[in-house]
Structure formats: structure tokens, C-alpha cells
Regions:
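Anionic group-binding determinants
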Residues: 1-151
Length: 151
């Protein structure tokens, strides 16, 4: 007999939603702290990925607390460029995404949020994978330029 308590829940490989246009669903995540920090003292980056096109925007942050202001600027920029509105945001449960200020802002703007369950990065796989891809690309570029390993 199998011990049910020790089994992990299965996560579907395919998304359970289908977007039909740009900005319908934005995946986001913060990566960091990264060492060494940049010359401008930035230790984190935040990614925004459009589920429809997979277009990705990356912003560098000194602190995670900058995420809300960056999101607001990102929202204005992409909505103006596409003449569409962000409808859903999928993220982890980091404090920058669960703050009262962020929740209130999303509610005012009509943005629904999908927050993944705790300790389940699989549920935010698009953003998690994109962060890993970006870090792999950076490491590859640094290695090809024969930069010291501390970079």
C-alpha cells in the first residue's frame, strides 16, 4: 500500500488556460541576489514574459522593493505600445507580489493575479525557466569573452 502523505502532487505539463492575445497573461519573477553586483550596484533582475508571444522584458533592481514601481512603468509602456491591457499576472508569493499596495493596484486596474502555491516553482515555470535561460546566456557570454570567474 502506497503512503499517500509522502507523495507529491502531480503538476500538468500543459497550461490549463489559453491566451488569445498579447498581454492577456504576464508571467513575472525576480531573480537574485546575484554576485557580484553590477557596477551600478544592482543585484536583482525582474522578468516580465507575455504568454502569447513569449516576448520578455528584463529590468535590473538594486532591491526587491523596487519591483512595484518597475511593474507600474512596465504596464504603462506595454499597454501604450500594444493598445491592449494586462489582464492576468502569474507570479510566486514573494512579498513584492503580495503586498497590500500591489494587490490594491492590481484590483484598481482590473488585473487578476495567479499566485503559485508555496514551494512549487513548477507553477511559475515560464518565469522560472526564463530566469535560468538568461543566467545561462550571461555565463556563456562571460566565458566566451574570457572574463574572470568572479564575474
Amino acid at each position: 500500500m502506497k503512503n499517500v502523505c509522502s507523495a507529491r502532487t502531480w503538476f500538468p505539463k500543459k497550461a490549463q488556460y489559453w491566451v488569445k492575445q498579447p498581454l492577456e497573461l504576464i508571467h513575472t519573477d525576480i531573480c537574485g541576489p546575484i554576485t557580484p553586483e553590477s557596477f551600478s550596484s544592482k543585484r536583482y533582475f525582474i522578468t516580465f514574459i507575455d504568454d502569447f508571444s513569449r516576448k520578455t522584458w528584463v529590468y535590473f533592481l538594486k532591491q526587491k522593493s523596487e519591483a512595484f514601481e518597475v511593474f507600474k512603468k512596465f504596464k504603462v509602456m506595454v499597454e501604450k505600445a500594444t493598445d491592449k491591457q494586462i489582464k492576468f499576472v502569474r507570479s510566486d508569493r514573494g512579498g513584492e507580489y503580495t503586498s497590500t499596495t500591489f494587490m490594491k493596484y492590481c484590483k484598481e486596474k482590473g488585473i487578476r493575479r495567479f499566485l503559485r502555491a508555496l514551494y512549487t516553482p513548477q507553477q511559475n515555470g515560464v518565469a522560472e525557466r526564463k530566469n535560468r535561460t538568461i543566467l545561462d546566456m550571461v555565463r556563456s557570454m562571460l566565458k566566451s569573452k574570457k572574463m574572470p570567474k568572479e564575474f
